[in-house]
A protein has these predicted regions:
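Extracellular beta-propeller repeat domains
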Residues: 2-419
């Protein structure tokens, strides 16, 4: 799967359209639909009601050829422990499957990473729990039947899968597991494992493509993988690396890892980012773009960065901790002119959410200038978006927003200028 210049994710091998949407979680249960960008209007498309309906959607959407959207929720459903659901239009939602973490279920739940799909309408994802309580990979049929393809044991095979799965033309699934693996010197008790990159075949056989050691190569891989035309994978680790603050890595088809960049927290004379936490995107020239959740200025408010094919890093913008935003946790989207768009969890000037502000939607242009396109108020528009945006061909971008109540949810869409 190759990320196109406008961050349109190719799902051709899967029969799914290129749109990936993010849910917004807000107290007022609204979708924010701006048209045009200068005159934003808000519209409720669907309010999740909690069990037996879905609750707390956290993963990205995928869209099928008929225009239906599919995703996962961490809560809700028959057992209150997560769902896979379909949104077929305003006010039209169907719970396709209810996950169960109870002892009598022998399954798992709380899926947070969203879904991938194939040409037959099957859906694939990951969730917590499973036979060993360290996560599993599942398949859902078009009729809602579930098959567990693989249960992670928490040993050398990995644990705690993180990020949306990537599916190739042969049906193999690829992803990151933030724990487990051959090296156990990571985690709070130094026994959780440093994480792996894994592959699961159509028959449910799992193979570890790379074991992170927790040293210079990184630890705790996060987010989704990106793949180029040559079959190389790109991803990020939250920690590890030369300085201990995370890496961006490349993994070739033979399982050889190259660290493209090791992040370095603020030190005298140095203002790199630290701890990348969102998905990477890749342009047609092979440059990678992403965000870090800390580093940058002295207050460690995060950065937007670019990496060349050779690993040369350019910090495009350092957040200042005010109206511009604080802590970008999600990934970025990029338009045809090279402008980057994303969200910050805090900042923006409105303190109805926390003392640090309710968050922003921002744009960083090719000259490194940042504009806060929307400052969340914590009211009807929501607040504190932890995820990134998606920008389609019409310039419609979406984000997800959290709420302390975590009861009512909806999708937030904002039409952004493509200029």
């Amino acid at each position: 799967m190759i990320t196109a210049p406008a961050h349109q994710i190719s799902q051709e091998a899967q029969g799914f359209a290129i749109t990936v949407l993010f849910l917004a979680i807000v107290l007022a249960s609204v979708i924010v639909a701006a048209r045009p960008a200068q005159a934003q209007m808000f519209e409720v498309l669907y309010s999740f009601q909690g069990s037996p309906d879905a609750s707390g959607p956290t993963g990205p959407f995928v869209r099928d050829a008929a225009g239906n959207f599919f995703s996962t929720s961490a809560g809700g459903g028959t057992f209150g422990q997560g769902t896979a659901f379909k949104l077929s239009g305003p006010g039209k939602e169907t719970v396709l499957y209810s996950f169960c973490l109870q002892l009598y279920c022998h399954e798992g739940g709380n899926p947070t990473a969203g879904l991938a799909g194939d040409t037959q309408g099957n859906l694939y994802g990951t969730a917590s729990g499973g036979s060993f309580d360290t996560g599993f990979v599942f398949q859902l049929s078009p009729t809602g039947g579930e098959v567990v393809l693989y249960n992670f044991t928490g040993a050398a095979d990995g644990a705690f899968p993180d990020g949306r799965l990537l599916r190739d033309a042969e049906g193999n699934l690829y992803g990151n597991a933030a724990g487990g693996g051959a090296y156990r010197n990571c985690g709070l008790d130094n026994a959780e494992g440093c994480g792996v990159v894994f592959k699961v075949t159509t028959t449910g056989t799992e193979a570890v493509l790379y074991n992170f050691t927790g040293g210079a190569d990184g630890a705790q891989p996060v987010g989704a993988l990106v793949r180029d035309q040559k079959g190389n994978f790109y991803g990020a680790t939250l920690t590890g690396g030369k300085y201990g603050y995370g890496t961006v890595f490349r993994l070739d088809g033979g399982g050889n890892e190259t660290v493209l960049h090791s992040f370095r927290l603020n030190q005298t004379g140095h203002s790199d980012g630290a701890n990348p936490n969102g998905d990477l995107i890749r342009d047609s020239k092979g440059n990678l773009y992403g965000t870090t959740s800390s580093g940058g200025n002295l207050n460690s408010d995060g950065v937007v960065f670019k990496l060349s094919k050779t690993g040369k890093e350019t910090v495009l913008y350092r957040f200042q901790g005010g109206l511009d935003g604080i802590i970008p946790l999600g990934g970025l989207v990029r338009d045809l002119k090279g402008n980057l768009y994303g969200t910050t969890v805090y900042g923006g000037g409105y303190e109805n959410c926390y003392n640090y502000g309710c968050g922003t939607v921002f744009k960083v242009d090719t000259a490194g200038r940042e504009i806060a396109l929307h400052r969340f108020t914590g009211g009807a528009d929501g607040g504190n978006p932890p995820g990134g945006l998606f920008r389609d061909a019409q310039g419609i971008s979406t984000a997800r927003l959290p709420t302390a109540a975590f009861q009512r949810t909806a999708r937030m869409a904002a039409e952004l200028s493509s200029s």
